[in-house]
Amino acid sequence: MSAQCGLCFHRCRLAEGQTGLCRARANRGGRIVPLGYARLTSLALDPIEKKPLRRFRPGSLILSAGSFGCNLRCPFCQNAEISTAGEDFPARDCPPEELVQLALGLRTRGNIGLAYTYNEPLVGF
């Protein structure tokens, strides 16, 4: 049974077992399911200046987290290996509650929050 994904502008129509253009959603039993939910491919404590923000809390750190999959194909993407990967890419399970606790635990090292990055964050919704 085919199903249509409505998460992004591509609106992929997927046959049973097929994965969408983003490689982060698939048709399983006629339902669109997220493949990367609560799975991390990358995790790092980064300077806030690495984010595309200007003059936001300069000198602070932020926990950067990301998974696989992206609905874009930017020719300049510095994370293409991660963002265009699929569910076979090495990832670790990390439920949202665990990620929040990790971010909170890093406050003593100057962490100010959590940034979803490395891939297009919407596809993991």
PLM segments and residue spans:
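Local cysteine-cluster metal-coordination motifs and their immediate loop/turn environment
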Residues: 3-25, 68-80
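Conserved Radical SAM active-site core
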Residues: 27-125
